[in-house]
Amino acid sequence: MELHTVLIMLSLLPLLEAQNPEHAINIGDPITNETLSWLSGKWFLIAVADSDPDYRQEIQKVQTIFFYLTLNKINDTMELREYHTKDDHCVYNSNLLGFQRENGTLFKYEGEVENPSHLRVLEKHGAIMLFFDLKDEKKRGLSLSARRPDIPPELREVFQKAVTHVGMDESEIIFVDWKKDRCSEQEKKHLELEKETKKDPEESQA
């Protein structure tokens, strides 16, 4: 479930006319070095859609999520740093993401469990989207994230169409209300600490 909320990474799959969800989407564009560089940085979770009513109930408890992705080229992983606003309090988490370059699959590791999702990138809108468990009608889900918390109506409509094209209903979509964010101060403190940490080695060499 955690992967749904956070990976919130991303991407927009082509929307085709076929009615069968397995054929309606061409899942998994290859992940290149250029893709990984583009993904690096800050993202805002915009919306989540899920066919599991229990999961929708849980995700509604999480008011906002934004996250940072940092590429590690040495071992082909990405660091995921998440800021969740829940019950008007900020919760910070960090984790590692793995990926398969050939089929555009992302993995979040939770203990020994490997949770996959399928990634496509929509550079035109500065947005990314993840697709989960499309073959399972009871667990099927999508998430949309963007570089900015305020998205244009066009992108909102694209996400809504993506939801219906995989056999889900627009009523299963939950949009994030960014006025409820409570993590800006904690993020600021972390960024200041990172800045100071980068300064220290330089000062010691001076």
UniProtKB/Swiss-Prot annotation:
InterPro entries: A1A_glycop, Calycin, Lipocln_cytosolic_FA-bd_dom
A Gene Ontology term for the protein's cellular component: extracellular space
UniProt entry keywords in alphabetical sequence: Acute phase, Disulfide bond, Glycoprotein, Secreted, Signal, Transport
Protein location: Secreted
Annotated region (Disordered), positions in chain: 187-206
Chain ranges passing through the membrane: none
Pfam families assigned to the protein according to its UniProt record, in alphabetical order: Lipocalin
Signal peptide range in chain numbering: 1-18
Disulfide bridges in this chain: 90-183
Primary location class: secreted
Biological process annotations from GO: acute-phase response; regulation of immune system process
Glycosylation sites: 33, 75, 103
Protein task: Functions as a transport protein in the blood stream. Binds various ligands in the interior of its beta-barrel domain. Appears to function in modulating the activity of the immune system during the acute-phase reaction.
PANTHER family: ALPHA-1-ACID GLYCOPROTEIN (PTHR11967), ALPHA-1-ACID GLYCOPROTEIN 1 (PTHR11967:SF2)
Entry's free-text remark on domains: Contains a beta-barrel that binds various ligands in its interior.
UniProt record similarity statement: Belongs to the calycin superfamily. Lipocalin family.
The name this protein goes by in its record: Alpha-1-acid glycoprotein 3
Protein's gene: Orm3
